[in-house]
Amino acid sequence: MSTKPKNAAHLSESAQVDSGSVQPFTRSQKIYVQGSRPDIRVPMREVTLDVTPTDFGGEINAPVTVYDTSGPYTDPNVIIDVRKGLADVRSPWIDSRNDTERLPGLSSHFGQQRLSDAELTALRFAHVRNPRRAKAGANVSQMHYARQGIITAEMEYVAIRENMKLQEARAAGLLTQQHAGHSFGASIPKEITAEFVREEIARGRAIIPANINHVELEPMIIGRNFLVKINGNIGNSALGSSIEEEVAKLTWGIRWGSDTVMDLSTGKHIHETREWIIRNSPVPIGTVPIYQALEKVGGAAEDLTWELFRDTLIEQAEQGVDYFTIHAGVLLRYVPLTAKRVTGIVSRGGSIMAKWCLAHHQENFLYTHFEDICEIMKAYDVSFSLGDGLRPGSIADANDAAQFGELETLGELTKIAWKHDLQTMIEGPGHVPMQLIKENMDKQLECCDEAPFYTLGPLTTDIAPGYDHITSGIGAAMIGWFGCAMLCYVTPKEHLGLPNKDDVKTGIITYKIAAHAADLAKGHPGAQIRDNALSKARFEFRWEDQFNLGLDPDTARSYHDETLPKDSAKVAHFCSMCGPKFCSMKITQEVREYAANQRIEAVDVDVARGLAEQAERFKQEGSQLYKKV
């Protein structure tokens, strides 16, 4: 059977970047903060603000720095060509450690087969580098370096990134007020330092997913003592999609704030598509290797073997995948516990491994070969994302014996991974009513010794198809506050169909709101800067600043235009809901002006004097209770 792509849209020569993903944000500029060496340049987005109107004091408002996941795509000084991929960021750092070697070619059998297939030439990414691997006996994981007391360039990079110029913001008066947080036992410092990052990684409380073969990566960190992160999912299906479409899904997602991206492809040309995605991704890429392994055996779970899965791990590690979801906690003895569930096993990876276990009546080969998996992953610094194959698919099944039994096993596997100095996070539910969410977080912290938790929502009710980004956003905000480190987004199409670009954006913005709300509640240093700046802009009727400081400036601006479309409305001193006579903020401004004119402090208006003035006016007008108007 020919593997040649039939659709011309698949061809590499036609691939172009998505135009919507490369537009700079209005009144924003990409800035880079340099670290201790010239090649540590940490990207951020700086939002320029208007001067406060003269009526409100006329002061200059300092620019606000915000976290930026969009990579070079929103930098007008960078020429983007998806056919060449992004610039190499990390090779000098990796070279300086002198513990890796460049292989003469791909070492996975499947990778070699794909490379030798001439019919795939038109589809293949043209600028593939030979992969790196740890030298014999070496461990190249960030956790290994951290436990040796080494602060890597990646650790310094994420420390700078997490702070977002916090010292400068304080000096500019952008953080005059921040409410104290309640962190539920997290140890969040007033400022993130590179040494703190090293300590957290060494302890296992945080990870920097950073495969040595993903040199285009802009490093980021996942951990309960850092900013809450979000993940977005992409991937082709059996129906197929073009290279251009898959890269567009990536760039669109990171534009709106996706900190990592999981490629869940199940269709044709998975290997080639993944190469394009990684070469064009500034954020960590995660996969579920069992999906591709299943494709290799024609979808028959019972035909899976350790040897085939091992080759798939090597194939993906050599491409540069940063973290693997491994469903090693789905044990044979747990499968019967799901029999009386309302929704059974809803995890695709979990159901694959459950079917394999039952077909062979043997223990999960991902569990029995777990240390072999560790040996592969530490040679490339691929992080574990230990999959929750028995997560609840309905609130009726939340916190049951199957779910928590698997979680306890994931805790055991975490300790084995840590023995190999492997970075590890734990995946969680799913569907959980609000009153049971904290129990999930507490149980995970206990079983997995504070390894980062990564959850899908959770959805807090099952009655809202079409609105599951909201049902899950509620749970995501709660579990993020309780200590969850990364939240996997849910779109409005969850359970219903494949999301389009608008759905993806809606899901990401919903989860950015949840993550930020959790950061505020935890008391992350500087989390309130953006809120304070936007609130000040709102009170001063600086409309453009309100739009530009928001998570989604385009939608905010379009909603305002629906009511007040003229440019003059963008400087109006009233809001679009109440109009000029009933705007509460306009009235408050008038009260302040009155107080100032009467030489009365706005914060301590002389109420008695005001009452006396009104009483005298009542008498002068005839002391009539009612007057004709």
UniProtKB/Swiss-Prot annotation:
Gene3D superfamilies documented for this protein: 6.10.250.620, Radical SAM ThiC family, central domain
GO cellular component: cytosol
Keyword terms: 4Fe-4S, Iron, Iron-sulfur, Lyase, Metal-binding, S-adenosyl-L-methionine, Thiamine biosynthesis, Zinc
GO biological process terms held by the UniProt record: thiamine biosynthetic process; thiamine diphosphate biosynthetic process
InterPro entries the record matches: ThiC, ThiC-associated_dom, ThiC/Bza_core_dom, ThiC/BzaA/B
Residues that, per the record, bind Zn(2+): 431, 495
Binding site for substrate: 233, 262, 291, 327, 347-349, 388-391, 427, 454
Polar residues bias (residue ranges): 13-24
Binding site for [4Fe-4S] cluster: 575, 578, 583
Family note: Belongs to the ThiC family.
PANTHER family registered for this protein in UniProt: PHOSPHOMETHYLPYRIMIDINE SYNTHASE, CHLOROPLASTIC, THIAMINE BIOSYNTHESIS PROTEIN THIC
Database matches in HAMAP family: ThiC
Name assigned to this protein: Phosphomethylpyrimidine synthase
Organism: Pseudomonas syringae pv. tomato (strain ATCC BAA-871 / DC3000)
